[in-house]
Amino acid sequence: MKKILAFLLVVVGISLVAGAVDNEKDSKFKPIAPDMDTIKHNIENPYSNYYYKKLWRKFLSNDTNMSMQEYRHLYLGYMFQEDYDPYRRSEFSEKIQPLYYKKSHTPAECDTIIKYAELSLADDPFDLRQMEFFIYALKEKKKYARASIWQFRLNHLIQAILSTGKGTKEMPWVVTSPIHEYVIINNMGMMAVEHQPLEGEVDYIIVDKPKDKKAPEGYYFDVSMLLKIRHQKFGD
C-alpha cells in the first residue's frame, strides 16, 4: 500500500502545491499567517459567517462553495473545540494499522479499512492520514463518488494549511497536529528524514534530497498554538 499511496500523494501533492503557487501570484490570494485571536472570536460568535457550527454544517453537507477563509477557520478553529487534543489517536485507527503496510489489499480488507477509517474520522474529524487511507480504500472498491467527496475535503484542508505560510523560517505553516507536518511533506512528493524541534515552538522537517536542486532542504511548521492549548488543557 505504501507504493500505491506514494503515487496518489505525489499526484495530489503536485496539484495542491502548484495551485498554492498559482494562487500566491494572484493579487487576491497570498499566504497569510493566521491571527488566532481573531479566528477564536469569529468561530465563537453566532452572528459571524465563521461561526464554527455553521462551518461544520457546511463541511458535512459537502458545500463546494466554501471559501478559503471558511476552510482556514474550520481547520484552525478546531483547536478551540472541547474535544481537541493534538496528540490524541483514535482507537479505531490502530485496528487497521497493520493493513497500511501491505502492497495490495483484498476487497474484504478494503471493507475493513473503510469501516474503521470512517469510525476514526467520526472520532477525530481532521485526521488527514486516515482520510488518505479512507479515500484509497473507497477507490479500490470503486466507490468513486464517495472518494471524490472526501478527496475534495482533504484537498481543501491541505490548501488551508498551505495558506498559512510558505514553509519557511520566516513564514512557517501552521498545523493543528504534528502528524499533519508529514502529510504536507508527503503531498509534495517528498519524504521526511529528520525532525528538529526549534526555539519559538517551531518544527523543522528535513526532507530527502529533492530532484529540484532549488528546493529547500526542509520546511518549517508553527506548532505554538497547539502546544499552548495542549498545555492549558492537560498541563504537560
Q: Residues of each region from the PLM?
A:
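Bacterial Sec-dependent N-terminal signal peptides
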Residues: 1-28
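N-terminal alpha-helical interaction modules that lie
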Residues: 21-110, 172-236
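Residues that mark the junctions of alpha-helical repeat units in TPR/alpha-solenoid scaffolds
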Residues: 88, 126-127
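TPR repeat positional signature
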Residues: 92-95, 131-134, 138
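Conserved structural position within tetratricopeptide repeats
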Residues: 119-122, 156
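Boundary/linker segments of alpha-helical solenoid repeat arrays
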Residues: 128-129, 156-170
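TPR/TPR-like (Sel1-like) alpha-helical repeat modules
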Residues: 139-162
